[in-house]
Amino acid sequence: MNERVNIEPTTLTQRHPELGTGPVPTDMYWQPEWYERELKAIFRRAWMCVGRVEQLPKPGAFFQKELPTFGFNVLVTRARDKKIRAFHNVCTHRGNHIELRKEGHCAGFTCPFHGWSYGLDGKLTAVPDSEGFFGIDKGKLGLHEIALDVWEGFIFINLEKEPAQTLKEFLGQQGADLVGYPFDRGVATFEYEGVINCNWKCMVDSFCETYHVPILHRHSVKDTLAGPDNPYGRLIDCRLKGPHRTQSVWGNAAYRPNPVQGLAFANAPGPSITSGAVEEGVKLPKGLNETRAPHWSIDVTVFFPNWIIVMGTGRSEEHTSELQSRFGI
């Protein structure tokens, strides 16, 4: 059973006085120069989530992941040795895409331009009319591999040739505190995407506060995350863990959805306020509802720089804020 922990309310600025209490600078949200610095200093160095191991159930499986941030896509494969690898989806001959399908199963890849073939391990296996080339060395012409590692079934890549940190080091306490959550028992129920005309940090920031809930979500989740005891939906807890952060969201225990609302919320991250999970003693990872508050609903965990998991007791959902540069008046 989860042990109740009674702690005095502590604000984020009390824990981290270095954050200050003044207005937030705005240059980082609109200056093209700042954005270019972010690409080099952050996104080319950070570990980024590209998928789940369940997308590669057996050898021969593959999927593509678009990286609009950099204008290319990544090919993620499971080879005969069962190892998961990632490659630039680019033929080493003339730079053509070698695979056009978003996902599938195959024995290898053949470039549709000149027929160069590669194994699922990225090795160059065949070159038509290889005698017509001078000094061709297949061992040096395989697909360009990208650093890859797995955390709790999530596949991460790093675009640095030699990443400065391992994935475990990069995730740090945030990753350690969430080990054991039953991600592998989940079933993907839906996926959606949208284009939002804003800086990528605006999207991430919106998940890090619940101040907007009573207004923006007044026709949907307002009554689940705000109520007479907490009319503005203030957070229970907020913590910084290295570059990552997590927020515990309050839940209205008095809320009872009508049948239509219950159906709409059926595939949302399961809040304890409707399942009674905290009362029933569902075992949670250390980092989920860290204060063990009985009126807890969900945690919003933000993995730097742009990956978010909304986690309840029974379901979770992931959000990624992708980047596409468009600057203008």
Features from the language model and the residues they span:
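Rieske [2Fe-2S] iron-sulfur-binding domain
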Residues: 55-161, 165-176
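A broad, structural surface signal
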Residues: 36, 40, 44, 89-92, ...
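A noncatalytic interaction/capping subdomain that flanks phosphate/NTP-handling catalytic cores
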Residues: 1-2, 30
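Short Pro/Gly-enriched beta-strand edge/turn motifs at strand-loop
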Residues: 45-50, 57-58, 127-132, 301-305
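C-terminal catalytic domain of Rieske-type non-heme iron oxygenases
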Residues: 3, 61, 83, 89, ...
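Non-catalytic accessory segments flanking enzyme active sites
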Residues: 24-69, 75
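GGW-centered surface loops in extracellular recognition modules
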Residues: 329
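Short, contiguous pre-domain boundary segments
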Residues: 6-26, 184
